[in-house]
């Protein structure tokens, strides 16, 4: 991995993971209970898949299996594609997302807003 890419990963890393842990106190059938919830909505694109995409891309750069200018292609039904769209754009990659044509327009538009090309696939196409 080049020094420039290492610095890019270092700059964006604080926006992924390190999400707060919320402790909720409640009573169930008369007994005190505690519930812990990770606030993954604090991630870059608001979901846990940011961690997955970040780790995959960082490891791919470290191993040399992805280079600047390579295209990222992901098959997804939503959140992973959103994460790859955002991180791919940040790292300077073209991103193509294949997803089912019955997914919400909001997901499609969000990925496109990050610069991804979204290609819809019908049930028949698989």
Q: What spans do the regions from the language model cover?
A:
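PLP-dependent amino-acid enzyme catalytic core
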Residues: 1-126
């Amino acid at each position: 991995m080049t020094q420039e890419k290492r610095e890019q990963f270092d700059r964006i890393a604080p926006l992924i993971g390190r999400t707060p842990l919320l402790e909720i106190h409640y009573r169930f059938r008369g007994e005190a209970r505690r519930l812990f919830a990770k606030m993954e909505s604090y991630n870059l694109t608001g979901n846990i898949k940011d961690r997955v995409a970040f780790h995959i891309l960082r490891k791919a750069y470290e191993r040399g299996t992805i280079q600047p200018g390579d295209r990222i292609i992901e098959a997804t039904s939503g959140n992973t594609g959103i994460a790859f769209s955002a991180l791919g754009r940040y790292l300077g990659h073209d991103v193509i997302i294949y997803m089912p044509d019955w997914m919400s327009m909001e997901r499609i538009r969000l990925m496109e807003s990050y610069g991804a090309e979204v290609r819809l696939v019908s049930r028949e196409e698989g």
